[in-house]
Amino acid sequence: QYHDFTLDVRLRRPRIHPGRALSTPSFFIDIDGVLYGGSAPVAKGPGVLAYLRGRGFPFLLVTNTSRMSANDIQEKLAGLGYQVNSDEILPVSLAAAEYLTHKFDAARCFLIGDDSLARLLEKHGHTVSRKEESADAVVIGQSLWADFGEIDIARRLALQGAEVIALHRDATWPDGDVTRIGLGPIVAAIESVIDGAVTVIGKPQ
């Protein structure tokens, strides 16, 4: 069951600072299951975003997917009738890359995740490895499969001081007509064998 859009227009107008196009977004809007379900947009979805834009309420579309770039998502939404710009979309993979830049400048990362996440991290100046070698961070992103060997490497690197960063901790994620195990069980497994906390980047955190 997908969210039905309702609006309360008694909202505070965003503050616009001199020299800046937008202030903090008035709305943070999820994408999958909110703007579309499967291959179809939700009823009134495109109209709601057009309404917000017309009323001067800036919004940011947020998603826990780490397998699509902002441009990929923008193209998908355009095909569903949504008129949005790529800079109005924040995938969790981009948020993670920016977090690593803020924390480490150029981080050495051990990655549990797919190649699209590896490419994005490298594009932002980080080094990505799937081997057990010195690392600043263990990054856990979406992957069809993760094995105990990777979790064991992550454990040892964490014990050596690497920060463990998970893109989210959703228990499952939709993949067409089925659901698959998400990052939540992987994060829980790593948490059970390390002393420190896992940094979670995505929503709702």
Q: For each predicted feature, which ranges?
A:
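Cationic, low-complexity basic patches in intrinsically disordered or flexible, solvent-exposed regions
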Residues: Y2
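HAD-like aspartate-dependent phosphatase fold
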Residues: F5, L11, I16-I31, L35-Q205
